[in-house]
């Protein structure tokens, strides 16, 4: 485990009060971090996009291995801390923006890219769809989500939700590992999972046929 006391102290200093209701959970498990970084294949792509870097725990791992990291954070307090924490990281670009309003072509400069993220539970589905349905989607996405959500996305035909259809049309999903509640501050009420989505070279269904498939 990482130093949970330091994480709590940093949150207090920034007056950030994470809540379970909003799905604000900060990862403090070094083993889970290692799984995310390895699954994200961050050293094989010219650009890695991190969504919600928070206190920079995952960001630190990424800048050690990736060619270029673009970290998108909505909270201005956290962005200010990240600028200070990573002032010497020449391969990191910090962006204070809502990822759901972000143009991925503009963000990545048309480069191939991978996504890694510890996603707030409340915005998991919108963020996944934002990336995979974008004109310039990532080659690989590795996201930390609720275990039940990951299982639904990986469901077999005949037991698939609308979200599972939308994801599997565009990507091949698999669950890398399960992460227990005590790996976070604050601890969520449920287990999480590291979910990997590898983009298909060609979607299984043409865009104009998707509505019929997902009825």
Label each residue range with its predicted role.
Residues 1-215:
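Catalytic cores of RNA-modifying enzymes
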């Amino acid at each position: 485990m990482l130093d949970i006391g330091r994480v709590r102290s940093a949150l207090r200093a920034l007056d950030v009060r994470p809540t379970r209701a909003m799905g604000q959970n900060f990862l403090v498990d070094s083993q889970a971090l290692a799984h995310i970084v390895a699954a994200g294949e961050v050293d094989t792509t010219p650009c890695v996009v991190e969504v919600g870097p928070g206190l920079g725990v995952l960001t630190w791992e990424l800048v050690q291995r990736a060619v270029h990291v673009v970290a998108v954070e909505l909270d201005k307090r956290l962005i200010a801390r990240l600028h200070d924490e990573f002032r010497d990281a020449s391969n990191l670009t910090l962006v204070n923006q809502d990822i759901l309003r972000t143009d991925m072509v503009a963000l990545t400069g048309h480069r191939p890219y991978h996504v890694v993220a510890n996603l707030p539970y409340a915005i998991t589905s919108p963020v996944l769809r934002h990336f995979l349905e974008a004109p310039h989607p990532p080659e690989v996405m590795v996201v930390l989500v609720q275990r039940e959500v990951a299982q639904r996305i990986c469901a077999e035909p005949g037991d698939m939700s609308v979200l599972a259809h939308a994801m599997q049309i565009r990507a091949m999903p698999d669950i890398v590992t399960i992460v227990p509640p005590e790996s976070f501050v604050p601890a969520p009420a449920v287990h999480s999972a590291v979910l990997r989505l590898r983009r298909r070279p060609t979607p299984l269904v043409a865009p104009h046929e998707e509505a019929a498939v997902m009825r």
